[in-house]
A protein has these predicted regions:
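A short glycine-rich, His/Asp/Glu-containing loop-to-beta-strand
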Residues: 1-30
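Glycine- and acidic-residue-biased ligand/ion/polar-headgroup-sensing regions
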Residues: 28-47
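Short acidic-glycine-tyrosine-enriched beta hairpin
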Residues: 47-68
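Double-stranded beta-helix
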Residues: 74-101
Length: 101
C-alpha cells in the first residue's frame, strides 16, 4: 500500500507472509529506508549477489538501502514493513525472484 507519493518521496507499507520473500534486487537510483513494524525477518544486503551479509531484524528495527546495494527480505513470521524512499518506483533490477516477476 502506498500511503504517500510526492516528487520528493514515497511511503509504502508492505505485508509479507511467513516464509515468503521479496526479490533479490537492487536499485540504480532509489534510496530507501525500511522499518519493521511487526514480526521478524531475515535481511540480506551487500555489494553483489555473491557478497551478501544476513541480518535478523525484529519489530522496531530499521535499515537503509542505498542505491546499488543488492538486497532481499524474507519473513520469518508475518511482517509489516514501513518503507520510505525516493520516488523512483520503477527502479527495480531483479536478480532472482521466487515468483517469476
Amino acid at each position: 500500500m502506498i500511503w504517500a507519493h510526492t516528487d520528493q518521496y514515497v511511503g509504502k507499507i508492505l505485508h509479507v507472509n511467513p516464509g515468503h520473500a521479496l526479490s533479490l534486487q537492487y536499485h540504480e537510483v532509489k534510496d530507501e529506508t525500511i522499518f519493521l513494524l511487526t514480526g521478524e525477518m531475515r535481511f540480506w544486503a551487500g555489494p553483489s549477489a555473491d557478497e551478501l551479509e544476513e541480518v535478523a531484524l525484529g519489530a522496531g528495527e530499521a535499515f537503509r538501502v542505498r542505491p546499488a546495494t543488492v538486497h532481499r527480505m524474507e519473513a520469518i513470521t508475518e511482517i509489516d514493513i514501513l518503507e520510505a524512499s525516493t520516488p523512483h518506483l520503477d527502479d527495480v533490477v531483479r536478480i532472482q525472484d521466487r515468483y517469476g516477476r
